[in-house]
C-alpha cells in the first residue's frame, strides 16, 4: 500500500529498529535494574521486559503521549508503603517472604550477645543467610546497612516529623511491621522518665510550700511532701527497672534512642530526678542534718557530668550533630541539670563546685536559647505551631534563679533577672488558649510539667524576698497551675494505660532504615531515547514551518 506524502505543516519522526549491539546494551541495562529493584522470588523474576521497536512513522503527538505515559508510570514507583514489608523479598523483622505465616522476628533489635546465641542454632543461621542474600544487590552492596550501625542525625530529620520526631513520614519505610504489636520493652521509650521528672519536681514544690515563710499562712502539712516523695521514688524505681530490662534485651533499640536528636536529651532525666529527690527529701528523714552527704552528689551528678561532656563536645566540635543541626526545646534537659546539680552541691556544702556548675549551665543555656530563638534553617525539630514542648524554655532560667539564691543565700539582681526571663516566657506561653489542644498525648508530656513546677518554686523564693500580696498571689497561682497540670496528666496516663490501652504504641521512630530505600534509577545512555527524538522532531517541525513561511514570502 502506498504511503501518502505529508505537507509542510505535518512533521513525522522516522523511528527505525535499534541495531543489535545497541539493543543488547539496552536489554542488559534493563535486566540489571530489574534485578536490583524487583522483590519477587519466583520463576518470573528473571523475565525481561519485551523490547519495543518501531518500524513505522508516528506523529509527534503520539511521541508526546507515550512520553507522558512512561513518566506517570515512573512517578508511581517512587513511593514506598509505610508497612515494613516493602523490602525486595524481605518481610518485616527479618523474615523471608515465604508465605508460611511465620511471626515477625524482632531479634534485629536485641543485644549482640543474645543475637549471637540465636545464631548458634541452625535454623537461625539459615534465616540470617537468606536475609543477607535478599538484601544484597547485584554489585555486592546492600540496600540497607546493618541494624547495628548508627543512624545519622540527618536521617532522623529526613525520615521523621513532629516536634518530638516520633512520627514516620508517609514516603518512608520501617524495619518492623506497623500493624503488628511489638514487644512491650520495644514500645517502652526513654521518655517515660518524664513521668518521674513531673512527680519529683512536685515533691520539691510541696516541700517549699510547707517550709516557706511566704506561704506559712496556708498551714500546709509536710505529709503531702512525704506522700509525693515516696510515690515519686516508687515510680522512678519501676521505670528504671523496666528500662534496664530494655537495655539488657534490646540494647540496639536503646542505641537508636541515644542517637535520636530529641530522645538523647532524656538520658539526662534519670539523674535530674535523683537530684530532685535528694533536694526534696522529707524533713522527718533528716531532721537535724544541715548538709547532705557528698557521696549523694557524686553518685547522681557524676553520670550527668560525663554525659554532658559527650553532648557538649558534639555541639562544640561541629559535624553532623552540631548544635545548630540538632537543637530542639528538649535540649534544655541537658542544661537544666547543671543548675539542679549546683543546688545539690550547695546542699552538701560544696559552694565552689556549685558556682562552677552554675557558670557552665548558664553559658550553655544562652547558646541553646539563642539557637532556638533564631529558628535557623538547620533547626528542623522546632515546630511552627504551639506545642507543650515550648514549656522547656522556662525550665533553665527558673532553675538558674533558684540555684543562685541557694548558693549566695539571697534573691539578688542576678537571681531576679533569671526569674523575670522565666516569668516572661511563662506568660507568653500561657497567653495562648490552645496550648494543650490538638496534639496526640504522649508520656513525654510529663517532662514538660517540671518547668512549670520549677517556675512555681522560683516564684515562692521571689515572694520571700519581696513580700506582699501580689507576689504571694503569683506564687499560689503558678503552684496551682503546675499541680493541676500534673493531676490532669496523671488521670490521662491512667486512662491511656488501663482503659484505652494506648499509652505505649509501636515506637516507629526507632525502626527507621539507615538510609532511604526508595532509589531512583541512574540515567544511562540509550540507543533509542524517546525524549530525545521527540525534542528533535519538535525542532524539525519549527524549522520546517519557518522555511515554509519564508518560501511563501519569497513567492509573493
UniProtKB/Swiss-Prot annotation:
The chain crosses the membrane at residues 190-210, 217-237, 266-286, 296-316, 326-346, 353-373, 389-409, 419-439, 441-463, 480-500. Residues 69-79 have a biased composition (Basic and acidic residues). Induction: By drought stress in guard cells. Keywords: Abscisic acid signaling pathway, Cell membrane, Coiled coil, Ion transport, Membrane, Phosphoprotein, Transmembrane, Transmembrane helix, Transport. GO terms for cellular component: membrane; plasma membrane. InterPro entries: SLAC/SLAH (IPR030183), SLAC1/Mae1/Ssu1/TehA (IPR004695), Voltage-dep_anion_channel_sf (IPR038665). GO terms for molecular function: monoatomic anion transmembrane transporter activity; protein kinase binding; protein phosphatase binding; voltage-gated monoatomic anion channel activity. Activated by GHR1-mediated phosphorylation which is negatively regulated by ABI2 but not ABI1. Activation by SRK2E/OST1 and GHR1 is repressed by HT1. GO terms for biological process: abscisic acid-activated signaling pathway; inorganic anion transport; intracellular monoatomic ion homeostasis; monoatomic anion transport; multicellular organismal-level water homeostasis; organic anion transport; regulation of stomatal closure; regulation of stomatal opening. Pfam families: SLAC1. It is a multi-pass membrane protein. It is found in: Cell membrane. The modification Phosphoserine is found at residues 59, 86, 113, 120, 146. The record marks 450 as: Important for channel gating. Residues 25-34 have a biased composition (Low complexity). Residues 211-216, 287-295, 347-352, 410-418, 464-479 are extracellular. Residues 86-99 have a biased composition (Gly residues). Phosphorylation by SRK2E, especially on Ser-120, activates the channel. Also phosphorylated and activated by CPK21 and CPK23. Abscisic acid (ABA) promotes phosphorylation. This phosphorylation is inhibited by ABI1. Phosphorylated and activated by GHR1; this phosphorylation is repressed by ABI2 but not ABI1. Phosphorylated by HT1 on N-terminus but not C-terminus. Residues 10-36 form a coiled coil. Residues 1-103 are annotated as: Disordered. Residues 1-189, 238-265, 317-325, 374-388, 440, 501-556 are cytoplasmic. Changing residue 38 to F: In slac1-6; normal ozone-triggered rapid transient decrease (RTD) in stomatal conductance. Preferentially expressed in guard cells. Also detected in the vascular strands close to the leaf margins. Belongs to the SLAC1 S-type anion channel family. Slow, weak voltage-dependent S-type anion efflux channel involved in maintenance of anion homeostasis. Cl(-) efflux through SLAC1 causes membrane depolarization, which activates outward-rectifying K1 channels, leading to KCl and water efflux to reduce turgor further and cause stomatal closure, that reduces water loss and promotes leaf turgor. Essential for stomatal closure in response to CO(2), abscisic acid (ABA), ozone O(3), light/dark transitions, humidity change, calcium ions, hydrogen peroxide H(2)O(2), reactive oxygen species (ROS), and nitric oxide. This is Guard cell S-type anion channel SLAC1. The lineage of its organism: Eukaryota, Viridiplantae, Streptophyta, Embryophyta, Tracheophyta.
